[in-house]
Amino acid sequence: MLILGHPLIPSARFIFIKNTDAVHSSANNDIVYFEAHPKNLELAKYCCENGVHFSVIFLSHKIETDAFFLFNAFKPLYCIFKDIKQAILAQQHATNYLLDSKILFSMDLNDTESWEICAKNQIDGIISKDSLLLK
């Protein structure tokens, strides 16, 4: 299981962006991320075409299967979910379709129950909710 955002485990810095201009102000080793909203498909395409490491975060509590597959066409490093049910379903899709993107669940790292749910459902990894600042 990947563990991102833990203070003792080194990982890349995640930078929230809203447009291509913000991509240019990030460092090469940063991972930019943005909301998995249809209006951001162009941003995903831009990142893919320009070799920018990016992730998408799914903020809605409803399953958005179409958005999940559309964004995965642009090969994000991570698909991040705030809703565990969505993360579990996305992990099933990622496994069945051999997607390159890793599925992450955003959680409080002190939440023992969430760790157990993620392990039981073989989620690729977790990311500290404190690592993800939405502006």
Positions of the model-derived regions?
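Residue-level signal for glycine
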Residues: 75, 101-102
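Generic hydrophobic/packing signal
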Residues: 53, 75, 95, 122-123
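Glycine-rich beta-to-alpha transition loops that act as phosphate-gripper elements at the mouths
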Residues: 36-38, 56-63, 79-84, 103-112, ...
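Catalytic cores of alpha/beta
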Residues: 65-71, 84-93, 110-134
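Structural signal for conserved beta-strand scaffold positions within catalytic alpha/beta enzyme cores
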Residues: 5, 16, 105-106, 127
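Conserved N-terminal beta1-alpha1 strand-loop-helix module at the mouth
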Residues: 1-77
